[in-house]
Amino acid sequence: MKNDLKIKSIIKQAIDIHYHVGPEIIPRKFTVSELINSEKGKIGGIVLKNHFFPTSPFIKEVKNNEITLYGGVVLNNSLGGINQDMIISLREFDKNPIMVWFPTINSENFLKKSEFEIAPEWVKNQEFNARLSKDIKPVRIFKDGKLTKNTISFLRLIKDLDLTLATGHLSWRESRILSTEYINLGGRVILTHPIYQKINMPIKIQKELADKGCYIEQSYSMYSIDNIPIKKIVQQIRSVGCHSVILSSDVGQKFSPTPSDALYKFCSILLKNGFNYDELYLMLVINPKKLLGIV
């Protein structure tokens, strides 16, 4: 599979909807300019994620005619959580498709299940000092089991601004309610790697939300970093159906491969497990474009 030209052709058209870029507090493999130099001619587009800062300014700063890059923002504490003013400013700055991730490292769910704000497996450096989760105030989007008024108002705002919602590291129950609300508003939604151990959304709920119009993310990093068996990933994709699944890399860690290499490895593994090229094309090219509102 090392020189599978069909896979390479698909990845040249693919959009990786989940790539971690630096500079960031978490050590990252590439800055935007380094990413472009590495990936030009190898991948169609990349949505850039950063747990602490919006990535649209990173994109604007570099000259680039090689890869289509899309901005992203994560609603963690460093950006004020569910911050409407920040989103309005970001949309004024960047008129292109933008991914809005709900809280990740500062979600109540993640902080309850992780000793540290930044998971050690993301860094693999004993000298890196992460804050203890117990010392961090979570970004809450629920009160008494219901979405807060501010969250509902925020959802209406990002729908009006034509932004795509990703569920981040919310609990699966929170993700279910949030994504249903945004779908009902007519918005575009992707469930952020619901197979992740700290989310662990039941496949029944994934199918329920896919039927409503949500996309389901399956990331290479869940296999390469979080050690989720490929058999489980395959089972979940087949259960939901390729028409509702998007493959991503979710890499950018210092020790991880480049996004194009990660997607190549992912595709090679999936081909060995019964998938075909048309299905890979659907999950890497067509579905990401629909998610971002490009088609």
Describe the role of every protein-language-model region.
Residues 76-83, 166-170, 193-200, 219-231:
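Active-site glycine- and acidic-residue-rich loops that bind
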Residues 1-68:
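An N-terminally biased module of ancient metal coordination in phosphate/nucleic-acid-related enzymes
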Residues 13-16, 45, 68-70, 97-101, ...:
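Structural preference for beta-strand elements that scaffold enzyme active sites
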Residues 219, 242-259:
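Short acidic/histidine-rich active-site segments
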Residues 25-29, 83, 177-180, 200-206, ...:
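Histidine/acidic-residue-rich catalytic or RNA/ligand-binding cores of hydrolases
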Residues 8, 40, 58-67, 89-96, ...:
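Acidic (Asp/Glu)-rich catalytic clusters
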Residues 67, 80-192:
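Extended substrate/RNA-proximal surfaces in nucleic-acid metabolism proteins
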Residues 4, 262-295:
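Mid-to-C-terminal alpha-helical segments outside catalytic/metal-binding sites
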